[in-house]
Amino acid sequence: MPFPDFDPVLVQLGPLAIRWYALAYVAGILLGWRYAVAMVKNPRLWTHRPPPVTTEQVDDFILWVTLAIIVGGRLGHVLFYTPQIIWTDPLQILQIWNGGMSFHGGAIGVFLAIILFAMRNKVDLWRLGDLVAAVVPIGLFFGRVANFINGELWGRPTDAPWGVVFCNERIRETLGWCPAGEVARHPSQLYEAALEGIVLFLILRWATHGAKLLNRRGVVMGLFTTFYAVFRISLENVRQPDAGLENLPLGLTMGIYLSIPMLLFGLWLIWRGMREETPPALAPADKPA
């Protein structure tokens, strides 16, 4: 099927262009923020431990997360996928508006932000990580949909009836050619939006609201890390490898290599958290109002 004639720019205000990709980041951060606040306020989620942070601390942490996503995502993309620009065109590192963000880099940035915020505010590192992990799929969903609208990070060629030809007149006029060619490809961005966004959100929603796993330190973060890695590794088989990284050792992609440590870390977090003894149930007066 032909690629829809999406305009990556939502609104053009003189020299200022508001892009769908930027809007996806804003929507993911704002909705994730409100969801985190709602979780902190929900006493049914904190039956054995009080929330790790107050709603005011969640508000403060949003700035940390936003900076961590942008800086970590951009540096991760440069280091993992385009390290050559460090020497050939270092100013390009700052050109975020031209695209190029890495989930794995953003994840490292957010984890460092969690560590620093926890140390500064004397809150439990693993439990803050659990709260953050529960909301991340919201941002992943919007980000992958924006990738599709931008016509980037497409999949491998396919004969499936839902294959998309990522080429149209707008792409030709903007770039002068169609980088994806004129063959039908897997819409891998939408696969990722479904698995890393919707399915992963539902898994973590069950973990937090159904199984009450916020009472076990690090388990929700472990579930997020494990399932994200499993989904990403699986979908790398239908996602087109990044240019210049098609011939990595063992035939694996950069996404797989970066996800394997996540998988191991996630399994360790789950194992560690499930072995830890759960404290006694909180008295009603100790639960969040």
Swiss-Prot record:
Stated EC number for the protein is 2.5.1.145
**Keywords, comma-separated and alphabetical:** Cell inner membrane, Cell membrane, Membrane, Transferase, Transmembrane, Transmembrane helix
Q: Which residues of this UniProt protein bind a 1,2-diacyl-sn-glycero-3-phospho-(1'-sn-glycerol)?
A: 144
Pathway listed for it is: Protein modification; lipoprotein biosynthesis (diacylglyceryl transfer)
Q: Which residues cross the membrane?
A: 13-33, 61-81, 99-119, 218-238, 250-270
Pfam families listed in its UniProt record: LGT
Cysteine pairs bridged by disulfides in the record? none
Annotated GO MF terms: phosphatidylglycerol-prolipoprotein diacylglyceryl transferase activity
Q: Which GO terms describe its cellular component?
A: plasma membrane
Q: How does it sit in the membrane?
A: Multi-pass membrane protein
Which subcellular locations apply to this protein?
Cell inner membrane
Question: Mind telling me which PROSITE patterns this protein's record contains?
Answer: LGT
Identify the domain of life: Bacteria
- Protein's GO biological process: lipoprotein biosynthetic process
Member of which family? Belongs to the Lgt family.
So what does this one do? Catalyzes the transfer of the diacylglyceryl group from phosphatidylglycerol to the sulfhydryl group of the N-terminal cysteine of a prolipoprotein, the first step in the formation of mature lipoproteins.
Spell out the NCBIfam families in the cross-references: lgt (TIGR00544)
> What is the protein name given in its UniProt record?
Phosphatidylglycerol--prolipoprotein diacylglyceryl transferase
Q: Its gene?
A: lgt
